[in-house]
């Protein structure tokens, strides 16, 4: 099915077109949902919420950019709005002490273990870490997305890195 035709049918609330859109893109958007969620159940809920938003806003898509990129942006925004609404993002005080980086020492950890550790981070740290490290957003962009200051974004990132570093060190100690 041609993309323009698919979008037109989705705007008209054609269920078969919506189902086709879901089958075609769900696996890609699910990966994004996993990055921002604590577990698979929450990721699935976020995926469904994202598709509901996509179906509602699909008529607003302008063919100026990538349709897939537009859907990814909708997905991230839907998840962030959910966390803001549920008050997952309690701001840290602005005078939060910045964390000092430990001397760099490479630590080996499997990708699955690292992803598990990222999912275990408190929401505000996980969201900031994902947006900055995995998605390449600046602290200014993150602060706009999350409704915080750039200082809070930097503090949350530093704290996320510290927590991850400690989890990796503890794993290494437990294995030895």
Feature roles, as predicted:
Residues 5, 9, 144-147, 161-176:
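C-terminal edge and immediately downstream basic/flexible tail or linker adjoining helix-turn-helix-like DNA-binding
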Residues 7-29:
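A short, charge-rich alpha-helical start-of-domain segment used by transcription regulators
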Residues 11, 48-66, 85-86:
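Sigma70-family region 2
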Residues 22-40, 57, 118, 167-170:
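Amphipathic, Lys/Arg- and hydrophobic-enriched alpha-helical face
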Residues 31, 45-52, 65-77:
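Structural recognition of an alpha-helix C-terminal capping motif at a helix-to-coil junction
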Residues 59-63, 73-93, 159:
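Arg/Lys-rich amphipathic alpha helix in sigma70-family domain 2
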Residues 81, 85-112, 116, 138:
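Internal acidic/polar
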Residues 128-132:
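A short pre-motif secondary-structure segment
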